[in-house]
Amino acid sequence: MIQVLLVTICLAVFPYQGSSIILESGNVNDYEVVYPQKVPALPKRAVQQKYEDAMQYEFKVNGEPVVLHLEKNKGLFSEDYSETHYSPDGREITTYPPVEDHCYYHGRIENDADSTTSISACNGLKGHFKLQGETYFIESLKLPDSEAHAVFKYENVEKEDGAPKMCGVTQNWESYEPVKKASQLNFPPDGRIEFLQRYIELVIVADHRMYTKYDGDKTEISSIIYEIVNILTQNYRPMHIRVALTGLEIWSSGELSNVTLSADDTLDSFGEWRERDLLNRKRHDNAQSLTGMIFSENIEGRAYKESMCDLKRSVGIVRDYRTRRHFVANIMAHEMGHNLGIDHDRDSCTCDASSCIMSATVSNEPSSRFSDCSLNQYLSDIIHNPLASYCLYNEPSKTDIVSPPVCGNYYLEVGEDCDCGPPANCQNPCCDAATCRLTPGSQCAEGLCCEQCSFMKEGTVCRIARGDDLDDYCNGISAGCPRNPSHA
């Protein structure tokens, strides 16, 4: 285990509270001004990083002390991450920027098991955290020669028009069975499929309308997308899905697929472009288009359902909002949920929050959690139709993890046997959440060839053949499902 770097931040509350201010997050009606003062850090490793792997902040909210623990989101980018834009004559320009020492963090509030946080530390602190069921935002005021930040509740951000924002989901069938209750699901007794980690290698495309919306500032667009994906990855952690950004495209010379007022037509054209062009030069599982287009009928996002591993249909489109990154991230999480086969929530679905990610209408309140219905349907689908998500089992190379492992962040890193999250959240009996080691007597914690914490017998089919392919079999000595040596 690594020694966690502690950085204490003393936040002195300004003698008055602001009544109204315009921030990147919008027009805020009520806020506190605070001044982060960084106490000298503990000795660092010989190799210096601009952004620490782990930090701790202390401040007060409503007069009560809060301790915020942050850990760098080391799984944010894939090893082969690339960025592509286009010259004025349409020539493709691809770069591979260094992204290991980035400034995007996840975290928690000490002594609050239900807390979450997503923070950018690139230029001051910017992001949100959940404390005792309420969402707060922190953002730099960007005053000359000042470290002043604003802390405010989401309810104090002026909302846009109250018209219901709708999600559009394209079905490939006319009807489907309703979501079953948890008691009706036929889960394996050991739950090994439930605990199996899955990986979505994601490409995000900023269309030409978004490029012009931000005055051609590719750096700003990239930063916006990093922040969105940092929130998105946190949304999917409880589902044991790791989302890694593997590519970013900016259509700087013009639209490369049709973008119209019709969300259906725009989605269809984007899917055709992905199959025809993007897949031929960039390996990935899913592509999402971030667009500056305002679609008709109050559509905020559109996606195909149960399409995650389909060549054309593993796509979604999401409307960009300049000031509301968390809002865009939650819509994208919603559309990817449809790609995974998850339906809209019914009125009876709950998620211990004011709104859930898969609500049919988009709430102004941040929706950071999937409902019980969404989780149950997802688990049911991967048990009864595992081939529909076959592309999500190829783990990204661990060489992209360049900093020491952090136990409890859900990511299996070098030196760990398993990682099922913080002890309060871990539900895997094969994994000791406090040490990220296997529990006594366990041979494995997850994997297609792991059953009841033990390796499955040699010769057990772990991956059924598709088409002219061959079945894959467990070897009896590992939890993974090795490729059949007879594969051509």
Swiss-Prot record:
E.C. designation(s): 3.4.24.-
Active site per the UniProt annotation: 335
Cofactor(s) recorded in Swiss-Prot or TrEMBL: Zn(2+)
Domain of life: Eukaryota
InterPro entries: Disintegrin_CS (IPR018358), Disintegrin_dom (IPR001762), Disintegrin_dom_sf (IPR036436), MetalloPept_cat_dom_sf (IPR024079), Peptidase_M12B (IPR001590), Peptidase_M12B_N (IPR002870), Reprolysin_adamalysin (IPR034027)
Cofactor note: Binds 1 zinc ion per subunit.
Domain Peptidase M12B as annotated: residue spans: 198-394
Residue positions the entry lists as glycosylated: 258
Binding-site list for Zn(2+): 334, 338, 344
GO CC annotation, single: plasma membrane
Domain Disintegrin: 404-488
GO MF entry, a single one: metalloendopeptidase activity
UniProt-annotated binding residues for Ca(2+) 2: 406, 409, 413, 416, 419
Residues excised as propeptide: 21-195
Family from the record: Belongs to the venom metalloproteinase (M12B) family. P-II subfamily. P-IIb sub-subfamily.
Complexes and interactors: Monomer.
Protein's name according to its UniProt entry: Zinc metalloproteinase-disintegrin agkistin
Organism: Gloydius halys (Chinese water mocassin)
Upper taxonomic lineage: Eukaryota, Metazoa, Chordata, Craniata, Vertebrata
